């Protein structure tokens, strides 16, 4: 029997999505794994959760069972200190940081686990940080010859000092409509379509409420497609392209992703998508991703253009990633991810 320490919740805006992903995993994980659920509250407290509520998008509550991480590297054991002072130890083989957004998939928790020499599922510090920061994703991938949209970066600390200058440079460089988004947020938080110049300052302010910097780029009239990747017995396996039919918004926002009905079209039926698996694999390896990821593209007349990379995609029942592999059940997708990570631990 193998033991999996499942980290979920976290301090980001995607706390409830992580909770839902963890709940789905707990319901479908195979019997070969004993799961140790450790939630992170919105304030950053690590707590041992003997159960996870059946609420789809719940919240990790401080139940008094605080988790103490090992004080020396290589020790795969946590101490659970209960409210009345009693404590007990729990051993594990592998950590699954099923966390979304900042302080979860941006390299921070990965750095802590690396420092403690604790094996974990998913990409390491560099790949996680580079994929989370859309500015550096574009820099790295464009240097590797992967098509990306042109962009303009606005750092939060400079915006209020040079607002008029930024607005002029953006209007000189681009034509409307534009798309404004935080540089380091997920689940489409802080994103806005901008049709006119007058809407631009508000959109930038909105993005900066959700991230340290904002990115402005052309708003393409082009479908977005998704490619999920998973390492299977040492071989990177790409799913077919997925297109998501949704209604009620101009883009695949939080409501469409998690609240409203959607339809997955697999495979996506668009021209100019030849070679998508090679491009997605190149992105995966250029950033040094591990175990699993999702790559998002726009389909243009000249071919695929990279949008974003997600090193910790949602694993809810409604999420794109587990739905992408039509020949695999949800439990098989999870087992493949875990087997890939566990094999690397045993080497």
Curated annotation (Swiss-Prot):
<feature type="binding site">
    <location>
        <position position="310"/>
    </location>
    <ligand>
        <name>Mg(2+) 2</name>
    </ligand>
</feature>
<dbReference type="GO" id="GO:0008360">
    <property type="term" value="P:regulation of cell shape"/>
</dbReference>
<dbReference type="Pfam" id="PF01820">
    <property type="entry name" value="Dala_Dala_lig_N"/>
</dbReference>
<feature type="binding site">
    <location>
        <begin position="171"/>
        <end position="226"/>
    </location>
    <ligand>
        <name>ATP</name>
    </ligand>
</feature>
<dbReference type="GO" id="GO:0005829">
    <property type="term" value="C:cytosol"/>
</dbReference>
<dbReference type="InterPro" id="IPR005905">
    <property type="entry name" value="D_ala_D_ala"/>
</dbReference>
<dbReference type="InterPro" id="IPR011127">
    <property type="entry name" value="Dala_Dala_lig_N"/>
</dbReference>
<feature type="binding site">
    <location>
        <position position="296"/>
    </location>
    <ligand>
        <name>Mg(2+) 1</name>
    </ligand>
</feature>
<keyword id="KW-0464">Manganese</keyword>
<keyword id="KW-0547">Nucleotide-binding</keyword>
<keyword id="KW-0573">Peptidoglycan synthesis</keyword>
<dbReference type="GO" id="GO:0046872">
    <property type="term" value="F:metal ion binding"/>
</dbReference>
<dbReference type="Pfam" id="PF07478">
    <property type="entry name" value="Dala_Dala_lig_C"/>
</dbReference>
<dbReference type="GO" id="GO:0008716">
    <property type="term" value="F:D-alanine-D-alanine ligase activity"/>
</dbReference>
<dbReference type="GO" id="GO:0005524">
    <property type="term" value="F:ATP binding"/>
</dbReference>
<feature type="binding site">
    <location>
        <position position="308"/>
    </location>
    <ligand>
        <name>Mg(2+) 1</name>
    </ligand>
</feature>
<dbReference type="InterPro" id="IPR000291">
    <property type="entry name" value="D-Ala_lig_Van_CS"/>
</dbReference>
<keyword id="KW-0133">Cell shape</keyword>
<dbReference type="GO" id="GO:0009252">
    <property type="term" value="P:peptidoglycan biosynthetic process"/>
</dbReference>
<feature type="domain" description="ATP-grasp">
    <location>
        <begin position="138"/>
        <end position="339"/>
    </location>
</feature>
<feature type="binding site">
    <location>
        <position position="308"/>
    </location>
    <ligand>
        <name>Mg(2+) 2</name>
    </ligand>
</feature>
<comment type="similarity">
    <text>Belongs to the D-alanine--D-alanine ligase family.</text>
</comment>
<keyword id="KW-0460">Magnesium</keyword>
<comment type="function">
    <text>Cell wall formation.</text>
</comment>
<keyword id="KW-0067">ATP-binding</keyword>
<dbReference type="InterPro" id="IPR011095">
    <property type="entry name" value="Dala_Dala_lig_C"/>
</dbReference>
<keyword id="KW-0479">Metal-binding</keyword>
<keyword id="KW-0961">Cell wall biogenesis/degradation</keyword>
<keyword id="KW-0436">Ligase</keyword>
<dbReference type="InterPro" id="IPR013815">
    <property type="entry name" value="ATP_grasp_subdomain_1"/>
</dbReference>
<protein>
    <recommendedName>
        <fullName>D-alanine--D-alanine ligase</fullName>
        <ecNumber>6.3.2.4</ecNumber>
    </recommendedName>
</protein>
<dbReference type="GO" id="GO:0071555">
    <property type="term" value="P:cell wall organization"/>
</dbReference>
<keyword id="KW-0963">Cytoplasm</keyword>
<comment type="pathway">
    <text>Cell wall biogenesis; peptidoglycan biosynthesis.</text>
</comment>
<dbReference type="InterPro" id="IPR016185">
    <property type="entry name" value="PreATP-grasp_dom_sf"/>
</dbReference>
<dbReference type="InterPro" id="IPR011761">
    <property type="entry name" value="ATP-grasp"/>
</dbReference>
């Amino acid at each position: 029997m193998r033991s999996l320490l499942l980290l979920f919740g976290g301090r980001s805006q995607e706390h409830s999505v992580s909770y839902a992903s963890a709940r789905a995993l707990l319901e479908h994980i195979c019997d070969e794994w004993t799961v140790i659920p450790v939630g992170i509250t919105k304030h950053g407290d690590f707590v041992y959760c003997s159960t996870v509520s059946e609420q789809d998008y719940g919240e990790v509550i401080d139940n008094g069972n605080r988790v103490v991480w090992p004080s020396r590297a290589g020790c795969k054991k946590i101490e659970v200190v209960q409210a009345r002072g009693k404590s007990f130890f729990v051993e594990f083989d592998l950590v699954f940081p099923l966390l979304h957004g900042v302080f979860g998939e941006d390299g921070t928790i990965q750095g802590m686990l690396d420092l403690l020499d604790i094996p974990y599922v998913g990409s390491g510090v560099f790949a996680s940080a580079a994929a989370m920061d859309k500015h550096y994703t574009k820099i790295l991938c464009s240097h590797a010859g992967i098509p990306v949209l042109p962009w303009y970066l606005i750092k939060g600390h400079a915006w209020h000092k040079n607002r008029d200058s930024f607005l002029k440079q953006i209007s000189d460089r681009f034509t409307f409509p534009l798309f404004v988004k935080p540089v380091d947020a997920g689940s489409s938080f802080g994103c806005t379509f901008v049709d006119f110049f007058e809407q631009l300052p508000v959109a930038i302010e909105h993005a900066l409420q959700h991230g340290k910097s904002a990115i402005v780029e052309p708003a393409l009239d082009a479908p977005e497609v998704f490619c999920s990747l998973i390492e299977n017995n040492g071989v990177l396996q790409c799913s077919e392209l997925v297109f998501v039919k949704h209604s009620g918004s101009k883009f695949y926002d939080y409501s469409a992703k998690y609240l409203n009905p959607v339809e997955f079209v697999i495979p996506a039926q668009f021209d100019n998508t030849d070679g998508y698996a090679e491009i997605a694999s190149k992105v995966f390896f250029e950033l040094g991703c591990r175990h699993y990821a999702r790559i998002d593209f726009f389909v243009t007349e000249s071919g695929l253009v990279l949008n974003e990379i997600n090193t910790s995609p949602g694993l809810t029942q409604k999420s794109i990633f587990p739905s992408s592999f039509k020949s695999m059940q949800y439990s098989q997708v999870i087992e493949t991810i875990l087997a890939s990570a566990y094999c690397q631990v045993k080497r």
